Every structure is written in C-alpha cells, then in structure tokens.
Amino acid sequence: MKEIRPIAFFRSPLTSKFGIPRQSGLADNLVGKIVFESQYQREEALRGLEDFDYLWLIWGFSANKSTDEGKLTVRPPRLGGNERLGVFATRSPFRPNGLGLSSVRIKRIVDGVIEVVGADLMDGTPIYDV
C-alpha cells in the first residue's frame, strides 16, 4: 500500500480543537494559510488555481489522540450525545483512516502560499492533497 505524506501544513489562529467550526464554511471570517512543503511550493504546482474560487482539502486529524480507533459508532453532539450513529454518517474525527475533507474559499495566492477563508482546520494540520 502506498504511504501518503503531507504536501502542506495549515496555519490558523486556532491552536486547539475547541472553537473549531464543526464544518468548513461556517466561519466565513476565519482566515488560514496553506503552507506547502518546499518541493511543492513552486509556481508550476499552483498554476491555474487563480481561476478557481474554492478548493477541496484532504487532511489528517493529527491532534486526535483518542483510543477510540476502530470504533464504528460514535455519539454526535448534535444529537445530545445520547444516540449512536455509524461513523460514516457523521463528521466525527474518529475515523478508520483519520482523514478529513473540507471545502475552502481561496482569498489569494502569494509566494506559493494559499490564503483561504472558512476552513475548519486547526493550526499545524497536515494537508495530504488539494
């Protein structure tokens, strides 16, 4: 199986999981930056992005230190934490592969760094693909 490695890391004023919007797009004023690893922070890798308004980010729940790995049901807070749902029916960070998917709005691109609005990512979150 192919190993995936981060191509970038997200920079955000949110340094803990508390206060992070429950999904992307809910905090229109929250600005963050996608800072690429040096081998990807090149003009040719970003060419054409200026024609788009939004990006999909595939990222990892890197701060999830729970021992709940492998559980297939979770108690979502939106249901008061009283009902169990299958992990695939929720936005729970306790996922089999620990991957997240978010849509963000491009604000601007400067020197190989993409500034975005509306992300639900914590500072330092690894980004695996755009």
Predicted regions and their residues:
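Glycine-rich, low-complexity intrinsically disordered segments
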Residues: 1-103, 107-130
